[in-house]
Structures are given as structure tokens and as C-alpha cells.
């Protein structure tokens, strides 16, 4: 994992245990998404207590590192209010665990 990317803090509860979330700044996320096909970048807006589904915008089916999620959305739920430091620019990078 890129040392510039920080692991997600407990503000997020991941429903699917096979998915791992990391947070990064928007500029870094875009660069990672272009340079590493294993990373999926999603803009998200989190609201306390709400659930949101993140659809896969692209899949790299040739990579053995990437789990194929088929039609099941990735569901993330806020469990506490997050600061901008915890969720910089409200972007997350979703990678296969």
C-alpha cells in the first residue's frame, strides 16, 4: 500500500468484509486510479447514520488482485461524524482485500 494513503478510520463501517477502504486526497486518488488499475476511486458524500451504495465504475478483470463484485453494490454506513482530516475531500479509494 502506498504510504501516502491512510487507512480508513472508524467513522466508516464496511458492511462487506471482503472490501477494504482507504482514504486519500482527491488529487492523489485520481493519480492512483490512473496508475494502478487495482484501485477504484469514488467521490462520496457521507451523512451521519445514512447508508450509501458505491457502484463499481470500472473493473480490471485481467488482474488477479481484484475481486469481481458482480452486481452487488458496496454499502458503507457512517457510524460517527467524520472530520475533514478523516475524510479529506470526501474521496475514498476502494481496493480488493
Swiss-Prot record:
UniProt KW keywords: Host cytoplasm, Host cytoplasmic vesicle, Host membrane, Membrane
Residue ranges constituting the 9b domain according to the UniProt record: 8-97
Bilayer topology term: Peripheral membrane protein
Database matches in InterPro entries: Protein_9b_Betacoronavirus (IPR018542), Protein_9b_SARS (IPR037223)
Pfam family, one: bCoV_lipid_BD
Subcellular location: Host cytoplasmic vesicle membrane; Host cytoplasm
Domain of life: Viruses
One Gene Ontology CC term in the entry: host cell cytoplasmic vesicle membrane
Quaternary structure, from the entry: Homodimer.
Misc. comment: The gene encoding this protein is included within the N gene (alternative ORF).
UniProt record similarity statement: Belongs to the coronavirus group 2 protein 9b family.
Name of the protein this chain belongs to: Protein 9b
Organism in which the protein naturally occurs: Bat coronavirus Rp3/2004 (BtCoV/Rp3/2004)
Amino acid at each position: 500500500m502506498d504510504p501516502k494513503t491512510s487507512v480508513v478510520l472508524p467513522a466508516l463501517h464496511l458492511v462487506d468484509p471482503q472490501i477494504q477502504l482507504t482514504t486519500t486526497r482527491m488529487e492523489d486518488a485520481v493519480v492512483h486510479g490512473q496508475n494502478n488499475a487495482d484501485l477504484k476511486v469514488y467521490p462520496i458524500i457521507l451523512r451521519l447514520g445514512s447508508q450509501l451504495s458505491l457502484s463499481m465504475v470500472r473493473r480490471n478483470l485481467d488482474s488477479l488482485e481484484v475481486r469481481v463484485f458482480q452486481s452487488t453494490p458496496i454499502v458503507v454506513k457512517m457510524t460517527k461524524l467524520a472530520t475533514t482530516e478523516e475524510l479529506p475531500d470526501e474521496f475514498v479509494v476502494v481496493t480488493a482485500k
